[in-house]
């Protein structure tokens, strides 16, 4: 049971209503930075395990 297009549209509409048009670009920017930092952290974590073994 995946998300259909209508479900995705409803979720995006709710996010738009909660954050408003002015705040939405800042929220998306912060989310992207957080995801990038998480990916870099996971990449660094994998390298540390190889060095310790």
From Swiss-Prot:
<keyword id="KW-0472">Membrane</keyword>
<comment type="function">
    <text>Part of the twin-arginine translocation (Tat) system that transports large folded proteins containing a characteristic twin-arginine motif in their signal peptide across membranes. TatA could form the protein-conducting channel of the Tat system.</text>
</comment>
<comment type="similarity">
    <text>Belongs to the TatA/E family.</text>
</comment>
<comment type="subunit">
    <text>The Tat system comprises two distinct complexes: a TatABC complex, containing multiple copies of TatA, TatB and TatC subunits, and a separate TatA complex, containing only TatA subunits. Substrates initially bind to the TatABC complex, which probably triggers association of the separate TatA complex to form the active translocon.</text>
</comment>
<keyword id="KW-0653">Protein transport</keyword>
<keyword id="KW-0812">Transmembrane</keyword>
<dbReference type="GO" id="GO:0043953">
    <property type="term" value="P:protein transport by the Tat complex"/>
</dbReference>
<keyword id="KW-1003">Cell membrane</keyword>
<dbReference type="GO" id="GO:0033281">
    <property type="term" value="C:TAT protein transport complex"/>
</dbReference>
<dbReference type="InterPro" id="IPR006312">
    <property type="entry name" value="TatA/E"/>
</dbReference>
<dbReference type="Pfam" id="PF02416">
    <property type="entry name" value="TatA_B_E"/>
</dbReference>
<keyword id="KW-0811">Translocation</keyword>
<dbReference type="GO" id="GO:0008320">
    <property type="term" value="F:protein transmembrane transporter activity"/>
</dbReference>
<dbReference type="InterPro" id="IPR003369">
    <property type="entry name" value="TatA/B/E"/>
</dbReference>
<protein>
    <recommendedName>
        <fullName>Sec-independent protein translocase protein TatA</fullName>
    </recommendedName>
</protein>
<keyword id="KW-0813">Transport</keyword>
<keyword id="KW-1133">Transmembrane helix</keyword>
<keyword id="KW-0997">Cell inner membrane</keyword>
<feature type="transmembrane region" description="Helical">
    <location>
        <begin position="1"/>
        <end position="21"/>
    </location>
</feature>
């Amino acid at each position: 049971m995946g998300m259909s297009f209508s479900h995705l549209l409803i979720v995006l509409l709710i996010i738009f209503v909660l954050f408003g048009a002015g705040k939405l670009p800042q929220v998306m920017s912060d989310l992207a930075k957080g995801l990038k930092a998480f990916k870099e952290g996971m990449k660094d974590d994998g390298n540390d395990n190889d060095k310790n073994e």
